[in-house]
Amino acid sequence: MTNIITRFAPSPTGFLHIGSARTALFNYLFARHNNGKFFLRIEDTDKKRSTKEAIAAIFSGLKWLGINWDGEVIFQSKRNSLYKEAALKLLKEGKAYYCFTKQEEIARQRQQALKDKKHFIFNSEWRDKGPSTYPADIKPVIRLKVPREGSITIHDTLQGDIVIENSHIDDMILIRADGTATYMLAVIVDDHDMGITHIIRGDDHLTNAARQIAIYHAFGYEVPNMTHIPLIHGADGTKLSKRHGALGVEAYKDMGYLPESLCNYLLRLGWSHGDDEIISMNQAIEWFNLDSLGKSPSKLDFAKMNSINSHYLRMLDNDSLTSKTVAILKQNYKISEKEVSYIKQAMPSLIVRSATLIDLAQLAYIYLVDSPMIYNQDAKEVIKNCDKDLIKQIIANLNKLEQFDKECIQNKFKEIAIYNGLKLNDIMRPVRALITGMTASPSIFEIAETLGKENILKRLNIIYYNLNF
């Protein structure tokens, strides 16, 4: 079998899109499964839209996900001389031609076809003209001379064979008037030079496939195996957009998802291995194949993503969870060693209530005794409407406790509830709001034991102040 070589070839015009990350993952897994190579190419021929920040985002996003490429990164912007050389070769062989038609004329013809309700294919008057007719005052483009007769067949692993008549394919531009190569030419020259054997990409590229194959044929290059995968859709079944939630990999990192979890989730968006839901990277490399790709678009499901992330969070040990949680909190707060120890001690009760690292950090804020309390809106309402005399009674009783462990604290609250003819939950609701700033949290008795009497009384004593909620 030929040595498998795949590639990921993003345009650096923005963040690393979640759909692009899945494409990179599939190419990476297919190469690794077959002991092949996986290359990274930056398609930065569009100088106006390509940015250094976007390139950095691609690099950091892939590295964070654990998708490591082989060899040096290829930059198309550094290869324009090779593209021009390739185009001139086609010119010499009569497979391409100089076209001097102005863009205004092409636009006029397109508008006329639209008016006549006809499909527009530009037919250049320069296709078969010689140098003696070339105008001296116009910079030409170089166009591919696509055969007028016959057809092109796209042999797609997933979509099957798709036949496109040559009459439906335009003489596409290979070199622009300014001397730069178009995407269509650059991608074919690069894939050939890099020895790419398999192309796995979104089915939005399917419309380009026949045009690209026409260029492959013109050069006499072998066409790589093509697999066009359905795009990721939003929960409503429409094409993924900003209204469906985060689109960039960096955003998912900031939302507290683990890279292993996100890879697992993306893998299952369009690929399956029986009923397996939790699949490690090593398992994915062992099992990945093109036969198990799905033909229908997958829908982005945050509930499923959270479920998978919860699983991976629970696989981490206490030290690792504490370290990751504290790192997030330190972005905004100064944290003492004492507070770190509180968080570490409380971690078992925090992790079971968290789907992401951000969830963990928000709950862990309860244990930042040296930072101002933050009360959510529900907690504010509970505190505003609570029986302040009851809270003062609770403060007095807790202050007298000599042993401040969760069992003693719980028993004391039960006594207070019985004394006041109340249910335990009735008195715990305002206490929880005052101690945690929330109306739902881990066990108050465990929190109290961890933080100690002094910190708990300090938080309850806020009831004495004129709260401006």
Curated annotation (Swiss-Prot):
It is an enzyme of class 6 (ligase). ATP binds at residue 242. A motif ('KMSKS' region) lies at residues 239-243. It is found in: Cytoplasm. Its EC number is 6.1.1.17. It catalyses: tRNA(Glu) + L-glutamate + ATP = L-glutamyl-tRNA(Glu) + AMP + diphosphate. It comes from the Bacteria. Catalyzes the attachment of glutamate to tRNA(Glu) in a two-step reaction: glutamate is first activated by ATP to form Glu-AMP and then transferred to the acceptor end of tRNA(Glu). This is Glutamate--tRNA ligase 2. It comes from Rickettsia typhi (strain ATCC VR-144 / Wilmington).
